[in-house]
Amino acid sequence: MMDIHQILKLLPHRYPFLLVDRVVELERGERIQAIKNVTINEPFFTGHFPNRPVMPGVLMLEALAQAAGLLSFDMMGEAPGDDKVFYFVGIDGARFKRPVEPGDQLILDVKLDRIKGGIYKFGGVARVGDSVACEAEIMCTMRTVA
């Protein structure tokens, strides 16, 4: 549905902070499913943890937020410019259920719950196979920057 080249046009993130590799499903204004292929080459594994590498939970949340950003830009039907940025403004109910290790494929399911007062609220679940790795409610807003 969306390859890395299309993702790079919509997200400002770059290595080592781009955490979405592909979009596999997208229902405009409703939901998105994306993937992050987790490899031993991720820079965070050097220190988290050297003898038992585990993806930091906060980066799983960031991957969900990036998927939410892709859903939002697609919903608006426009690509971001230098003057528009989506900011991650809040999170509720974050829960971590299982570790994510090198070789795992993180499946990111995000649905838009509502838009109110310029705040977009999403429900997100990150899975490895059928096993939930983390879940949270994510809030973002778009801002025009100079």
From Swiss-Prot:
Q: What is its EC number?
A: 4.2.1.59
Q: Which UniProt keywords apply?
A: Cytoplasm, Lipid A biosynthesis, Lipid biosynthesis, Lipid metabolism, Lyase
* One Gene Ontology CC term in the entry: membrane
Please give a single GO biological process term from the UniProt record: fatty acid biosynthetic process
Say yes or no: keyword Lipid metabolism present: yes
- Tell me what reaction this enzyme catalyses: a (3R)-hydroxyacyl-[ACP] = a (2E)-enoyl-[ACP] + H2O
Protein name in UniProt = 3-hydroxyacyl-[acyl-carrier-protein] dehydratase FabZ
Tell me what gene encodes this: fabZ
Q: Main role?
A: Involved in unsaturated fatty acids biosynthesis. Catalyzes the dehydration of short chain beta-hydroxyacyl-ACPs and long chain saturated and unsaturated beta-hydroxyacyl-ACPs.
User: Where in the cell?
Assistant: Cytoplasm
Question: Which family does the record assign?
Answer: Belongs to the thioester dehydratase family. FabZ subfamily.
